[in-house]
């Protein structure tokens, strides 16, 4: 099992973790229905980029 040779400071730990923050979800408004949905995803009524792609 690996064991560190030297203790890492709080500063080094914080610098390593600086890229771990989560960003908010990117939302778009559908042109046909006006529904808010996640980017690059089909809306609940089956539209994607203004075209009907799923028939329910």
Swiss-Prot record:
The keyword Ribosomal protein applies. One of its GO terms (cellular component) is cytosolic large ribosomal subunit. InterPro entries: Ribosomal_bL32 (IPR002677), Ribosomal_bL32_bact (IPR044957), Ribosomal_zn-bd (IPR011332). Residues 1-36 are annotated as: Disordered. Residues 21-31 have a biased composition (Polar residues). Residues 7-16 have a biased composition (Basic residues). One of its GO terms (molecular function) is structural constituent of ribosome. Keywords: Ribonucleoprotein, Ribosomal protein. One of its GO terms (biological process) is translation. Belongs to the bacterial ribosomal protein bL32 family. This is Large ribosomal subunit protein bL32. It comes from Shewanella oneidensis (strain ATCC 700550 / JCM 31522 / CIP 106686 / LMG 19005 / NCIMB 14063 / MR-1). The gene is rpmF.
